Amino acid sequence: MSEYSLFTSESVSEGHPDKIADQISDAVLDAIIAQDKYARVACETLVKTGVAIIAGEVTTSAWVDLEDLVRKVIIDIGYNSSDVGFDGATCAVMNIIGKQSVDIAQGVDRSKPEDQGAGDQGLMFGYASNETEVLMPAPICFSHRLVERQAEARKSGLLPWLRPDAKSQVTCRYENGKVVGIDAVVLSTQHNPEVSQKDLQEAVMELIVKHTLPAELLHKGTQYHINPTGNFIIGGPVGDCGLTGRKIIVDSYGGMARHGGGAFSGKDPSKVDRSAAYAGRYVAKNIVAAGLAERCEIQVSYAIGVAQPTSISINTFGTGKVSDDKIIQLVRECFDLRPYAITTMLDLLHPMYQETAAYGHFGRTPQQKTVGDDTFTTFTWERTDRAQSLRDAAGL
């Protein structure tokens, strides 16, 4: 059962400054891993008026024109003119990337790949809930879909006066752990100065909000706040400085589950901040898909240079068909959560990451993708291919 009667989550669009930074960091990772799948990459990005700075540590045999790549990401998002305050073609790009510390490398690299140590200490959480078809909390799902629709309406020309920066927030009402209504919707979207607030609010309401949210959950008491401060002309990196890793709750479960604090974007799979969080989602989703619980949160933790997790914990919030201790036993039997095993299990050594950097890392649909000669599946941690084996092992 959910302990909440109301719960709120937020999301931001691909044009939000922090998300620009995330997408640049993951574009750098993808470009490198496409040439050198065993590269070590930790790329951080800062964007502000007229400048994009990339920094971090990379060890690789690949060569990438990083300045050109950064510009392309910014332009593709929609910042392609001084009229919108930021232009990828003319902004300054600074590259201060160095090499990975040999002290870290010696703790990760092993002669036997399966003995690869964790790239750092830390704790990671995974979560799943049966309240939506994608086994994610409803508030974050709806928030993502709103800003995703905003980008679609902007790029397609349906609402040509929209600009890239936007934020959404959705409050859901719960009864007995199930979503029964949406009590509040907030959507703030950057726009051209020519459009009136009346026209903007009417169009956003009809073509974004009502188009996206389930009609049966909207009711006469639902509050709508569309651009509640009025004009939102100045946005993106002009309005706010953007940094990689500043939207970790947007990236995960919207606050419904706990978070270990480590960001995802710009990190290769040897960094358990990312790969173990993906594995946690994979485990939790398969547990819920198997019918072992209606809700499941898993915590895993690691020590730097050590392969085996230092702990695995499970909480099913009283919804489990078997005990949490039994589920932990099943997880240990069915999933290998050593870093190298996670990379293999989820097939993570492919240029799949820029797509994760906007609209959530979880609750997405796996798709086949080809980059050069490399064909692979994205969002592999969303598969439920181990649900039946978990059911069988649990005797259900």
From Swiss-Prot:
It is found in: Cytoplasm. It catalyses: L-methionine + ATP + H2O = S-adenosyl-L-methionine + phosphate + diphosphate. One of its GO terms (molecular function) is ATP binding. The keyword Magnesium applies. K(+) binds at E44. InterPro entries: ADOMET_SYNTHASE_CS, S-AdoMet_synt_C, S-AdoMet_synt_central, S-AdoMet_synt_N, S-AdoMet_synthetase, S-AdoMet_synthetase_sfam. Keywords: ATP-binding, Cytoplasm, Magnesium, Metal-binding, Nucleotide-binding, One-carbon metabolism, Potassium, Transferase. Pfam families: S-AdoMet_synt_C (PF02773), S-AdoMet_synt_M (PF02772), S-AdoMet_synt_N (PF00438). Binds 2 divalent ions per subunit. Binds 1 potassium ion per subunit. Gene3D superfamilies: 3.30.300.10. PROSITE patterns: ADOMET_SYNTHASE_1, ADOMET_SYNTHASE_2. Residues 100-110 are annotated as: Flexible loop. The keyword Magnesium applies. Mg(2+) binds at D18. Pathway: Amino-acid biosynthesis; S-adenosyl-L-methionine biosynthesis; S-adenosyl-L-methionine from L-methionine: step 1/1. L-methionine binds at E57, Q100, D240, K271. Its main location: cytoplasm. Its cofactor is Mg(2+); K(+). Its EC number is 2.5.1.6. ATP binds at H16, D165, A166, K167, D240, R246, K247, A263, K267. GO terms for biological process: one-carbon metabolic process; S-adenosylmethionine biosynthetic process. Catalyzes the formation of S-adenosylmethionine (AdoMet) from methionine and ATP. The overall synthetic reaction is composed of two sequential steps, AdoMet formation and the subsequent tripolyphosphate hydrolysis which occurs prior to release of AdoMet from the enzyme. HAMAP family: S_AdoMet_synth1. Homotetramer; dimer of dimers. Belongs to the AdoMet synthase family. This is S-adenosylmethionine synthase. The gene is metK.
